[in-house]
Amino acid sequence: TIINEYPGRLALFHVDVYRLAGPGDLDDIGFDEIMAQDGLTVIEWAEKVADRLPKERLSLSLLITGDRSRSIEIRACGKRYVEIIDGMSDVEYDN
């Protein structure tokens, strides 16, 4: 399945574009309709469809740092998301 929807207080849409040939295939799967809905959309392999992503967004990258370790890189695109990231820096996290 290329698109999975998980209902909840905020709907979560998981879009896996790995098997798509390119950005044009997004029309066939209803990508614009999903992006217009209220909810959170997570796009796996988003670099394959970079020209169709919203200009304002959060980009997350999972990086392999060892056999059993990963790190998460979060990049803000747009003022709203820069403010969200700035707010996250004030939160204490446990390791």
Where are the language model's segments positioned?
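N-terminal phosphate/diphosphate-binding loop that engages ATP/GTP or pyrophosphate donors
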Residues: T1-F13, Y18-G30
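Short phosphate-coordinating micro-motif centered on Lys-Gly-acidic
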Residues: A21-L26, D32-N95
